[in-house]
């Protein structure tokens, strides 16, 4: 299998399967001299960790990360810093229940990658989905923690803004609420509703989808490049690569098709020292594939978890029709734990774009230009 890496100068390769002994990643291209200890990574892994409440899979994984390489003691400070060499990160799997999959190992689960893995490779790890499992995303979160060290001045935050057909009230958006509820929801009233709503979905043995919004603030103007290195296209590709994601939009996204030209284009005024002030942010902080200095805003849609307790029709690998009930421990809304994953992927893209920008233009052009 190929295509397990992403990024250019900041490059991440993930490895491991859902029920294997461990998962992890190798981060290459991280500059030397950045303080990095396991606690810097663990804080983000803990936000994604399963089994924390009844709205997540009850698989109990500690997700304790180990840094295997790429760091050393700084002779001046005595602290641990990056060396500029590949950083290997390991997360052990400790709570696999492969027996849950024995009875259906030959049956293709509807909505899962079982059939296409067989069609492409002729062999697959049926235990928990193997490589296609969302378990792999823990490695991305670990890599994202390293990326944040490179772009420490950029604040990257995510939130769940829709569950099923129910959207939050954006007038009540409060970032302080995000880590106060199990849904990463910025609207306290919506979070209370989601609790009752998802309880009903869960008890019915079903699942539901969600929409996640990621906002990156303090990224300067100039990151990204035309034509095939566009910042928004790389963010979209990174978010689209997350398990169960079926759609991505930047800024107004598809809603821009409903606007007129005068409504959609973000007007500008002159601020301090001629620096532009944007009167709106329909573009989501990106124009022509290059950051504008405004908040970078991306949203992605996560489909309902395909593993549900209700019986469904399928076929097995021999072509025989079969009814399947998927047992095991699954998220009733996998979109919830996609929030820290989305943050991590945006962090990786921005770190990569920063390094590429620095490599191409150094500190950047002197702006504003003299009259």
From Swiss-Prot:
Gene3D superfamilies reported for this sequence: Chorismate synthase AroC
On whether Protein transport is a keyword of this UniProt record, the answer is no
Q: Which GO terms describe its cellular component?
A: cytosol
* Stored InterPro entries: Chorismate_synth, Chorismate_synth_AroC_sf, Chorismate_synthase_CS
Which family is this protein grouped under? Belongs to the chorismate synthase family.
Report quaternary structure and partners. Answer: Homotetramer.
- Provide the protein name: Chorismate synthase
Q: Which gene encodes it?
A: aroC
């Amino acid at each position: 299998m190929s295509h397990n890496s992403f990024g250019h100068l900041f490059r991440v390769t993930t490895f491991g399967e859902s029920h294997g002994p461990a998962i992890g990643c190798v981060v290459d291209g991280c500059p030397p001299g950045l303080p990095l200890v396991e606690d810097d990574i663990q804080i983000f892994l803990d936000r994604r960790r399963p089994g924390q409440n009844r709205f997540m899979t009850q698989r109990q994984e500690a997700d304790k990360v180990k840094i295997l390489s790429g760091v050393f003691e700084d002779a001046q400070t005595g602290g641990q810093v990056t060396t500029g060499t590949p950083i290997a990160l390991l997360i052990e799997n400790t709570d696999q229940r492969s027996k849950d999959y024995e009875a259906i190992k030959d049956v293709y689960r509807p909505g899962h990658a079982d059939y296409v893995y067989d069609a492409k490779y002729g062999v697959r790890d049926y235990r928990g989905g193997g490589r296609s499992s969302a378990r792999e995303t823990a490695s991305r979160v670990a890599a994202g923690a390293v990326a944040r060290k490179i772009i420490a001045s950029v604040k990257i935050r995510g939130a769940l803004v829709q569950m099923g057909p129910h959207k939050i009230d954006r007038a009540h958006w409060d970032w302080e609420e995000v880590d106060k509820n199990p849904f990463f929801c910025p609207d306290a009233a919506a979070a209370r509703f989601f609790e009752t709503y998802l309880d009903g979905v869960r008890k019915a043995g079903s699942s539901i989808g969600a929409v996640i919004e990621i906002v990156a603030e303090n990224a300067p103007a100039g990151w990204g490049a035309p034509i095939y290195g566009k910042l928004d296209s790389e963010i979209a590709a990174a978010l689209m690569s997350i398990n169960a994601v079926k759609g991505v939009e930047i800024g107004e996204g598809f809603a821009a098709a409903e606007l007129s030209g005068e409504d959609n284009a973000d007007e500008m005024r002159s601020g301090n020292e001629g620096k532009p002030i944007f009167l709106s942010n329909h573009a989501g902080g990106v124009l022509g594939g290059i950051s504008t200095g405004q908040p970078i805003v991306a949203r992605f849609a996560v489909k309902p978890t395909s593993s549900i307790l209700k019986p469904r029709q399928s076929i097995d690998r021999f072509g025989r029709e079969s009814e399947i009930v998927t047992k095991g421990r699954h998220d009733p809304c996998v979109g919830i734990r996609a929030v820290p994953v989305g943050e991590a992927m945006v962090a990786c893209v921005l770190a990569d774009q920063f390094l590429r920008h620095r490599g191409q233009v150094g500190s950047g052009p002197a702006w504003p230009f003299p009259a």
